[in-house]
Amino acid sequence: SGKKVAVVGSGPSGITCAGELARNGFDVTVFEAFFTGGGVLVYGIPEFRLPKAVVKREIDGLEDMGVKFEYNSVVGNMATAEELFEQGFDAIYVATGAGLPKFLNVPGENLPNVFFANEYLTRVNLMKANKFPEYDTPTKHGKNVVVFGGGNVAMDAVRTAKRLGAEHAIIAYRRTEDEMPCRRAELHHAKAEGVEVLP
């Protein structure tokens, strides 16, 4: 098409858009804030659920199609939208994801050893905190862990804690087990791994 498109973010939405655009003849550059591509597929979903090699294969396939990736590039800091247009981009697709935690506004949520799932999973999945001190990204490896929530992210966090040595891991959810929004398979796996559920 001869058109240049900037894709901001390399998570599921960003790489899907980049692939479709490349297949249709667009010149695509993906700007990613992290040092690797994949977004939540890499930093949020644990290796035991989605191997990083699968995501890398997808990114490599996009590069083979001509998609360019600019890592460690925070749009807004390294360039504004206006500056990207000045650099010759005809369009910008914003796929920045939802990486911010949802605060509960309850007493104690800012205490030491209280982590939001996205920070905890990012430390383990992307920054190799599970290999401390080999990698200098520590995270607590508690023997007793409580995860509040009933979605897939909560299941990922509690199952990761079990793999990091938690002897007693609990999922605490405000409604009934049947009302948990997680996939039934995720709940089944968590229970099979010894996670206790407190609805």
Locate the predicted segments by residue.
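Residues forming the flavin
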Residues: 1-199
